Amino acid sequence: MAKKTERAFSCVGCGYVHPKWLGRCPECGEWNSFEETPSLSSGDVRAVKKASSSPVQAFPLCAVRAQDAQRISCGIAEFDRVLGGGAVRRSAIMIGGEPGIGKSTLLLQIAAACGKSVLYVSGEESPGQIRGRADRLNIPIQNIELLCATRVEDVERVLNTRCPTFVIVDSIQTVFSPEAGAIPMTINQLKYCANELIAWVKERDSVLFFTAHVTKDGNIAGPKVVEHMVDTVISFERNEEDIRFLRALKNRFGSVDELGIFTMGENGLSAVQDTAGFFISTRQGMFPVGSATVPVCEGSRVFMVEIQALTVPAKSSVTRVFSDRIDSARVSRVAAVIEKRVGLKFSDQDIYVNVAGGIRLYEPAVDVALAMALYSARQNTPVKTNAAFIGEVSLSGEIRPVRRLKTRLKTAYGLGFSTIYVPIGVEHDTPPPYTLRVVGTLAQTIAEIFSKAKA
C-alpha cells in the first residue's frame, strides 16, 4: 500500500506552516501567500528517526576549553566594524537590501580587498556582467574565482575542489536543488540550500556570504528560519541620495549597535571618514523653524543629527503622523507629553518628522531634541543654532539620563555646539566658552529655550 503523504501549506513570505490553506497568514499578515508544500509521510519520519539513532554522549561544560573567535579582515574597515572586528571563521553572513542598492558591488569589493582565496557564485548575472563591474570599480581580481551556477550540488562540488576562504553566493534565492523539489525559489528550496552551504563552511575554516532579496516592506524575503540559521544578518539601507547604511540586525559574534556609513560613487562604495558632522550643515544664527540637533550614539561612534519637524492643521477629524526615520509611535508619544505637560495642542495637527541625511534613529536619547523640533514647528519659533539637546522624555515630562553622555558632550563641543541641555545628575567639567544647561523637565527646557528665542 502506498504511503500517505499529508498535505501542508506554507507562507511564501515568512515560512509559516499550516495544515490547511489560509487566506491571510497569521504570522506576517500577508494575503494569499499560502502555497501547498509536500510534507513527510509517517513512514518517512520513522526512517529519519531510525537513520539518526546513532548513540551520542553528553559531557560537562567545565571540561570544554573556551575559544576566542578567529576573525578575518574583509579588507574594508567600515564593514569589519559592523561585523565586530572582521568575519569569524566558520560563520555565515546574510546581507539583505532592496534591488540596486549595491549588495553585489559590496561583495565584489570585499572579494577584491580581503586578500584571501574567494569563490564568487553568481546565479543572477553573467560572467561578462561581473567582469564589467569589476573593471568599472577598478579593483584587482586575481584572487577571485567565478562560478555561474544555480544547483547547490554543483556549488558544493567546486567548493570541495577549491576550498576557498571566502564563499560568496549572489543570491541565495537563485540556488536550488532537485532534492528539495522541482520548483526553485520555494520555501523548502531556500531552507535546504542555505542549510547545505552553511553546513559546508561550519566544517571548514571558511566564511560564507550570501545576499537575500527583500519584500516591499523592507524585510528580508523568505522564511525566518534562514535568518536563525545564519550567524549574522546585515541590513543594507539607503537614503534618498547616494548614502548607504550597513546595520547588523543579528550578530552572534559581536554587537548589533554598530553602523557602517558609505557613499556610492563611480568607484563603488567608499567609507565616510568623518561621521561626527556628516549629517549636519554649517549655519550661523538660528536654525530653521522646526529643527533641533542631538548627538546620537551608534555603537562606538557619536555623530550629530538634525531632526526636522513640520505641523499643519489636520484636514480631517483623524490626525496623522508621517515619520519614516523615527518611529511614529515615539513621535506621537512625545507630542502627547508636550500637549499634556506644556499645554500646546497637537491633537488637531498632522505631524511630519524627518532626519537630515536619511539615517534611522532608534535610541530614546533623541526625545528632547524631537520635542524641541515639534514645539518650534508648532509655535513657528526657531531654536538657536549652537544649542544641542540630550535626554529621554518620560510620560510625566521628566528628562531622564542616557548612556555615554560624556562622549556625546565631547562630540558636540568639537563641532561648535556651545550650549548643551542635559538631564539632572550629570557631572562634567565644561571648558569655556561652552555652557552645560542641566534641566529636569520638558516644560523647564521649553520655557528656557523659547523665552530666550522670543526675547
UniProtKB/Swiss-Prot annotation:
Keyword Phosphoprotein in annotation: no
GO cellular component: cytosol
InterPro entries: AAA+_ATPase, DNA_repair_RadA, KaiC-like_dom, P-loop_NTPase, RecA_ATP-bd, Ribosomal_Su5_D2-typ_SF, Ribsml_uS5_D2-typ_fold_subgr, Rubredoxin_2
Keywords, alphabetical: ATP-binding, DNA damage, DNA repair, DNA-binding, Hydrolase, Metal-binding, Nucleotide-binding, Stress response, Zinc, Zinc-finger
GO terms of molecular function: ATP binding; ATP hydrolysis activity; ATP-dependent DNA damage sensor activity; damaged DNA binding; zinc ion binding
GO biological process, alphabetically ordered: recombinational repair
Zinc finger (C4-type): 11-28
Keyword DNA repair: yes
Residues binding ATP: G97, E98, P99, G100, I101, G102, K103, S104
Region (Lon-protease-like): 350-455
Known EC number: 3.6.4.-
Location of the motif RadA KNRFG motif: 250-254
Entry domain remark: Has a putative N-terminal zinc-finger, a middle region with homology to RecA with ATPase motifs including the RadA KNRFG motif, while the C-terminus is homologous to Lon protease.
Family statement drawn from the similarity comment of this UniProt entry: Belongs to the RecA family. RadA subfamily.
Functional description taken from the UniProt entry: DNA-dependent ATPase involved in processing of recombination intermediates, plays a role in repairing DNA breaks. Stimulates the branch migration of RecA-mediated strand transfer reactions, allowing the 3' invading strand to extend heteroduplex DNA faster. Binds ssDNA in the presence of ADP but not other nucleotides, has ATPase activity that is stimulated by ssDNA and various branched DNA structures, but inhibited by SSB. Does not have RecA's homology-searching function.
Record's protein name: DNA repair protein RadA
Protein source organism: Treponema pallidum (strain Nichols)
Gene: radA
